[in-house]
Design a protein with these regions (language model features):
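Helix-loop-helix hairpin linking two adjacent transmembrane segments in secondary transporters
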Residues: 147-194
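C-terminal transmembrane helical hairpin of 12-TM major facilitator-type secondary transporters
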Residues: 283-330
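Cytoplasmic helix-loop-helix junction between adjacent transmembrane helices
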Residues: 112-151
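Helix-to-loop junctions at the C-terminal end of transmembrane segments
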Residues: 64-76, 270-282, 369
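Residue-level signature of mid-helix packing/kink "hotspots" within the transmembrane helices
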Residues: 30, 58-66, 155-156, 263-267, ...
Length: 413
């Protein structure tokens, strides 16, 4: 199928749009976690219940990630990006209004955060497909690494802005911030996004249309590995701010700045991991190495926190970087293996499994912290990346699957 070529500048501009649309969605999805101190102080919630409220956007994403992926496979990236961003903005605005009515509105606010998560799920598959579709294989690791910085940068932006808005103007004002930036993303996506080329379904070879989950365990194993590796990431992101404030006496502003710095470093780590995978010509071997490093960093964090060492802050920074570095590699591998007619659903399945675990992590570990303390929680968390190490498939297996069963996502045939 012939398609009008785009310039290198246009390709990178599309990457920028995909990055910022996903970044702003992540401000909404992850920013509520930085309102846990406000929920505790102003509404009297304990850590477990505040963690549950903060996880509502993530729970909302779980039932819609695969359906959004199906819509992307059928209707294209542009439609999904602008519609999902607009709906996320509307839900965030409604939540901001509802929370102003006081503690009796927390159930309504939680429901609206859940609905916003359902809408925000749209950006994950759509932006990933947009990047994979417009970049050649030898640049995909780097490009997807850049796109995957949306999550840590979104977390960092949320940590920088939302706690201070909540402290000075209340939780409603804090929720207005993701409403505004997601509305901006909706307009930009509607105007500027170009869907990548792919062959019509009627002209596609049978192997491109075949279900990539049948006859192979590769995608299932990548999903399982990613679920295990997201636990330390979610733990560090959710409780870093409150840990620094309650255990080390940091102010909300100072703790927010440090969290933002760690997220920027994490974003750079994702880019470096993507470039590393391009140079190696492998996506999965680096994931195995990162899993080992994540386990080591969480164990060291547990030990330094147990002995009340000042080095625990530095170890937290290192853990924040290591635990996010694998995401782009798994995302790229899944899109390449699944092909142009299944990558939306495969990426949706990837995010569904990850975000279900991400949603469970705050309340479960919040309860564990309340009972046993932070060092025990950090040590238990280290078990998850340990379990992931032997599950990572060999790169030769995924290469064989791509070579025999899949076309290149988004590329004309």
């Amino acid at each position: 199928v012939e398609t009008k070529p785009i310039s290198t500048l246009r390709r990178w501009s599309l990457l920028s749009i995909a990055l910022f649309a996903t970044l702003f969605s992540n401000v909404f999805i992850n920013g509520v976690a930085f309102l846990i101190p406000t929920l505790h102080r102003d509404f009297g919630l304990d850590l477990a219940l505040a963690g549950l409220i903060s996880a509502m956007p993530k729970f909302g994403m779980v039932p819609t990630l695969i359906p959004w992926g199906y819509v992307v496979d059928r209707a294209g990236e542009r439609f999904v990006l602008w519609l999902g961003s607009a709906l996320t903005a509307a839900a965030a605005l409604a939540a901001a209004i509802s929370i102003g009515k006081g503690s009796h509105s927390l159930v309504l606010t939680g429901g609206l955060l859940f609905l916003g998560g359902m809408a925000a799920a749209s950006s994950n598959s759509a932006s990933g497909r947009l990047v994979v579709g417009w970049f050649p294989a030898e640049q995909r690791g780097l490009a997807m690494g850049i796109r995957q910085t949306a999550q840590p940068l979104g977390v960092g932006l949320g940590a920088l802005v939302m706690p201070q808005l909540a402290d000075s103007h209340g939780m409603g004002a804090a929720l207005m911030f993701p409403a505004a930036v997601c509305a901006l993303a909706a307009v930009v996506c509607a105007v500027a996004v170009i869907d990548p080329p792919r062959p019509p379904r009627a002209e596609a070879p049978p192997e491109d249309l075949a279900n990539p989950y049948r006859g192979s365990q590769i995608l299932w194993r990548i999903h399982a590995v990613s679920v295990l590796l997201v636990v330390p990431q979610a733990l560090v992101w959710t409780f870093a701010l409150v840990w620094m404030m309650s255990e080390h006496g940091w102010s909300p502003a100072s703790a927010g700045v440090l969290v933002t710095v760690t997220q920027i470093l994490g974003a750079l780590g994702r880019i470096a991991a993507g470039r590393w995978s391009d140079k190696m010509g492998a996506r999965l071997r680096p994931i195995r190495i990162i899993a080992a490093a994540a386990a080591a960093s969480m164990l060291l964090l547990a030990f330094t926190d147990l002995i009340d060492s000042a080095w625990s802050i530095a170890v937290l920074i290192a853990a924040s970087v290591v635990t996010v570095s694998d995401n782009g590699l798994a995302f790229t591998a899944i899109a390449e293996i699944a092909g142009p007619f299944w990558s939306g659903r495969a990426l949706g399945a990837q995010n569904t499994s990850q975000l279900l675990m991400t949603g469970l992590t705050p309340p479960v570990f919040g309860a564990l912290i309340g009972v046993a303390g932070y060092p025990v929680a950090f040590a238990v968390c280290a078990l998850f990346p340990m379990l992931a190490i032997p599950l990572v498939p060999a790169d030769r297996d995924s290469a064989n699957l791509m070579g025999t069963n899949r076309g290149s996502p988004g590329q004309p045939v």
